[in-house]
Design a protein with these regions (language model features):
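Conserved, mostly hydrophobic/aromatic
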Residues: 61, 267, 336
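Conserved phosphate/anionic-ligand binding catalytic regions in large, soluble enzymes, centered on
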Residues: 57-70, 332
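Gly-rich Lys/Arg/Thr-decorated short loops/hinges at beta-loop-alpha junctions or inter-strand turns
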Residues: 20-29, 225-239, 324-328
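N- or domain-start disorder-to-order transition segments that initiate the globular core
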Residues: 8-52
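Glycine-rich loop at the start of a catalytic domain that most often binds anionic cofactors/ligands
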Residues: 68-80, 103-111
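Active-site-facing alpha/beta catalytic cores
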Residues: 2-8, 88-244, 248-249, 271-272, ...
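Acidic (Asp/Glu)-rich catalytic clusters
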Residues: 49-52, 79-86, 132-139, 223-225, ...
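Active-site or pore-adjacent capping/gating segments
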Residues: 293-355
Length: 355
């Protein structure tokens, strides 16, 4: 046995080559019309966060995409609502393909697109990129969470707004990644509710960074960045309770300003702010609408987890997707469609009242 064989990859079962980001982009190109939509809506998000556009950013959609057909039906409905409220809201659809797990579980469409534990990542990458192309072709901009540093090379050119989640905001890898991403990025506060990790992350990502990554041709590369000027903070609640109330928002905005960061922020109506109760999300959205209507300037955006069917269902990877209810989440419980349309109307009305 060679010496290297005695010490390397002892717990690795196999390596499977994947197409490079450039190869997948050539197969599924962004196209001029989609690229124009992405560029325009990224600039609109930037202007909203800076207070130059008085609309509200609303990032809304399924907790995760597991069924592309149902996701496209949702997108078709959402684009109608986005057009209805276009003078008051910039609606961006959640298109989340990677899910962080506290222990184990389904890791998302990219990792396991067949929902059966087969981990066909090549198909997952292809499905994710195709889905983003289909949604943007409808005129609907897309948002996603960036969970690791390789997959963005396959999808980021089709993404208008990105998030770094509560479990990864403190990670140096994700701060470095965000510094080089081409779209506005929001960092969630920590799972314990602490805000400082998000402040530190936003500051770090706005600065130039150098790190190990991959280039479009798939080669390992030294990546040097200019820093991302469009970083912000997302209040999502935490172990110590919700943080969407007027005092929470005001204090967070003051801390952002004191740190020299964008003082306007995004509030997540789900997760710790709803106690993971999808019914409670609608109540949180209504309370945020009241803050906005009362003239609160710190809230630039709201996040909602929403699907065609309310609630959630358990995915059994041993069975696969055959028994699943179409349009219902297999991860976090979501608001149903009717509640979503109502929440969007309330948020739009709050913007009009604030003017």
């Amino acid at each position: 046995m060679d010496t290297i064989d005695a010490t390397a990859d002892l717990h690795v079962a196999s390596f499977t080559a994947l197409p490079s980001p450039a190869e997948l982009a050539s197969e599924l190109p962004v196209g001029d019309e989609r690229a124009a939509l992405v560029a325009r809506t990224r600039e609109e998000v930037r202007a909203i966060m800076a207070g130059e556009d008085d609309r509200l950013l609303v990032v809304v959609g399924p907790c995760s995409i597991h069924d592309a057909d149902a996701g496209l039906e949702y997108a078709g409905r959402l684009v109608v609502e986005a057009e209805r409220h276009r003078d008051d809201l910039l609606v961006v659809m959640r298109t989340y393909f990677e899910k962080p797990r506290t222990t184990v579980g389904w890791k998302g469409l990219i990792n396991d697109p067949h929902l059966d534990g087969s981990h066909d990542i090549e198909t997952g990458l292809r499905l994710a990129r195709a889905f983003l192309r289909d949604v943007t072709a409808l005129g609907m901009p897309c948002a996603t969470e960036f969970l690791e540093p390789i997959s963005p090379q396959y999808t980021a050119d089709l993404v208008t707004w990105g998030a770094i989640g509560a479990r990864t905001t403190e990670s140096q890898i994700h701060r470095q990644l965000a510094s080089g991403l081409s779209m506005p990025i929001g960092f969630k506060n920590g799972t314990d509710g602490g805000l400082q990790v998000a402040l530190d992350a936003a500051a770090a990502a706005s600065a130039p960074q150098a790190f190990l990554g991959i280039a479009a041709d798939g080669r390992a590369s030294l990546v040097t960045t200019t820093g991302n000027p469009d970083t912000s903070v997302i209040l999502r609640g935490g172990a110590d309770g919700p943080n969407y109330g007027p005092d929470h928002v005001r204090r967070a905005s003051e801390r952002l300003a004191a740190a020299g960061l964008t003082s306007r922020l995004v509030v997540d109506a789900s997760h710790g702010n709803s106690g993971k109760d999808h019914v409670r999300q609608a109540e949180v959205a209504a309370e945020l609408a009241a803050q906005i209507a009362d003239g609160g300037q710190a809230i630039a955006g709201v996040m909602l987890e929403s699907n065609l069917v309310a609630g959630a269902q358990k995915l059994d990877v041993a069975v696969g997707p055959a028994a699943l209810v179409r349009g219902q989440s297999v991860t976090d419980a979501c608001m149903g469609w009717d509640a979503t349309a109502t929440a969007l109307a309330q948020l739009a009305e709050s913007v009009r009242r604030s003017r």
